[in-house]
A protein has these predicted regions:
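Acidic, metal/ion-coordinating pockets
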Residues: 1-164
Length: 164
């Protein structure tokens, strides 16, 4: 809009993830920051898909001021720490999921709990079918002004629709 350039990107964390993934710091340093600078990106949004909150927070603190917003995903439960960091980057450790929160991370409770109790993956996980909550964050940017971030949960058992 109005000739502005927007970058939306994602990196994966490594802690407790048993996959051959690139180090997210290396990926940001060698790829994303170059794109932001070389292509004169006006607004940049980074999703950090990671298991642990400390890794998401470390990335956000390290790149504060380099991205418009950094937000975490993967653990399905929204954190209550949406804020603007010292150098102006909007951050929330995890924006949560869109799904039924009367569940175990969006799956039917019974089978998920059986898997936990028995340590066996033989119980098939199935999506919960209850009322969904849309979780996320609203990030507001204004050129030359302070950015803001607001956590949202709309509908379902977590409803706190502050946008209406």
């Amino acid at each position: 809009k109005n000739g502005k350039r927007i970058l939306v990107s994602q990196v994966h964390g490594q802690t407790f993830i048993d996959l051959p993934l690139s180090n997210p710091f290396h990926s940001i340093d060698t790829q994303l920051l170059s794109i932001i600078n070389d292509h004169e990106i006006d607004y940049s949004f980074l999703e950090v898909h990671a298991e642990v909150t400390s890794e998401k927070n470390g990335i956000a603190q390290n790149y504060d001021g380099k991205f418009t917003a950094i937000y975490g995903t993967h653990v399905h439960i929204p954190t209550s720490d949406a804020r603007v960091l010292e150098k102006g980057t909007c951050f929330q450790t995890d924006i949560g999921m869109t799904g039924d929160y009367n569940s175990v991370i969006g799956m039917k409770k019974e089978n998920a709990i059986k898997r936990m109790r028995t340590g066996s993956n033989s119980h098939r996980l199935e999506p919960a079918e209850g009322l969904a909550t849309i979780s996320g964050a609203v990030i507001t940017t204004k050129e030359g002004d302070t950015n803001s971030i607001q956590s949202i949960q709309i509908g379902g058992v977590l409803d706190r629709n502050l946008l209406s």
